[in-house]
Amino acid sequence: MRINPTTSGPGVSTLEKKNPGRXAQIIGPVLDVAFPPGKMPNIYNALVVKGRDTVGQQVNVTCEVQQLLGNNRVRAVAMSATDGLMRGMEVIDTGAPLSVPVGGATLGRIFNVLGEPVDNLGPVDTRTTFPIHRSAPAFIQLDTKLSIFETGIKVVDLLAPYRRGGKIGLFGGAGVGKTVLIMELINNIAKAHGGVSVFGGVGERTREGNDLYMEMKESGVINEQNLAESKVALVYGQMNEPPGARMRVGLTALTMAEYFRDVNEQDVLLFIDNIFRFVQAGSEVSALLGRMPSAVGYQPTLSTEMGSLQERITSTKEGSITSIQAVYVPADDLTDPAPATTFAHLDATTVLSRGLAAKGIYPAVDPLDSTSTMLQPRIVGEEHYETAQRVKQTSQRYKELQDIIAILGLDELSEEDRLTVARARKIERFLSQPFFVAEVFTGSPGKYVGLAETIRGFQLILSGELDGLPEQAFYLVGNIDEATAKAMNLDVESXLKK
């Protein structure tokens, strides 16, 4: 395990006279560096540019070697702004890839792509570091057993269950509850699985990253008093960063997650927001390196880059990394090469609906649009599969009848259809759930609902046993027993009002 020379002073000083080069050309975030004959750095080696700019300010820029050009020159991509760099500046080859701190010291902290803390909470223990470029686990290390990753969120566990060690695409516009759902998943994995989470903010708005951090502190996901008790490590490479940083920040987050999986043998949740920005940054870097663009102007190495990231996200015999990736779809075109390449790797999709959010049904997960490869009778069992299919059929029938209801009203429906609508409305409300992390906003305590409880609840609604209960009794409750208790309270309240 190497100490990271880019983040620890002694590491650089020992290498200073080892392999120095000189900056020969600087074009935006791309540097060409000349080295002495026979001393060329390897691809992916970290280079450090140290010196003073034209106004005497200290400059410290880390780059990553991307191409060997010949004539003892390499082309490298900078991980931070190249303002103030000049030709002739000394560039030191660290002799190793970028390495970042890993382990318990990362929890509750915010890092940049280099693994440097950016939250003004002091230095991080860098005794244990991992290089960000690592090979995917070998076949013999993989855990091929198909198992459900229980989240405690009814709509997810029943209709679009997550695979342990799988990859899930999270689709949703602004303001439909993506962040709250992410925070609830982080909270639930810590409580139910004893696991931790790593959040990789890739090329998104700095304001959103800051809001997420503040909300995590407010909801207790990050414990300010005792950082070691926090449940998440944050790695940010936001929109204002150079493309090199945005391209590599996903790997930094993944490396931190791999440590928890391989060394601590934990179940880890890895969030990537947004996977499209990873592809976009790769496209920018590819153009800067002079590669011929491929379809729609994307990099020719699109599938390779995506595969090198996604193949490291998997279950091994030690633990698992389950990844939830927000997917931006440019111009809502699902055939665009970026989302199309992402879909090839996904095991499940969770689609958030603005219509449900407008009705106040949270989490606003669309039960008909969300899918999962795990929803098969041989994996989840006949009972689960049958219940999920009947819930979907009832919801679909209600959706088909909505136009008729809007024009003619409920009275014009057949008795059977009226019963279907009543049950579908109960199902829709029962798919909502109070979240632990939303307690501070809603005032109602959060609920973790086990899969068996979830299936039992929906079976009771579908069988007609609860047809006599008012539909508002099913809104924002945990299991079905809470719904029946709420119905009794509503009866008592209405009797008192009379």
From Swiss-Prot:
Membrane topology, record value: Peripheral membrane protein
Alphabetical list of CDD domains matching this protein: ATP-synt_F1_beta_C (cd18110), ATP-synt_F1_beta_N (cd18115), F1-ATPase_beta_CD (cd01133)
Cell compartment(s), UniProt: Plastid, Chloroplast thylakoid membrane
InterPro entries: AAA+_ATPase, ATP-synt_VA_C, ATP_synth_F1_bsu, ATPase_a/bsu_AS, ATPase_alpha/beta_chains, ATPase_F1/V1/A1_a/bsu_N, ATPase_F1/V1/A1_a/bsu_N_sf, ATPase_F1/V1/A1_a/bsu_nucl-bd
UniProt KW keywords: ATP synthesis, ATP-binding, CF(1), Chloroplast, Hydrogen ion transport, Ion transport, Membrane, Nucleotide-binding, Plastid, Thylakoid, Translocase, Transport
Enzyme class: translocase
Gene Ontology cellular-component terms listed: chloroplast thylakoid membrane; mitochondrion; proton-transporting ATP synthase complex
Role of this protein: Produces ATP from ADP in the presence of a proton gradient across the membrane. The catalytic sites are hosted primarily by the beta subunits.
Homology family: Belongs to the ATPase alpha/beta chains family.
Protein name: ATP synthase subunit beta, chloroplastic
Gene name of the record: atpB
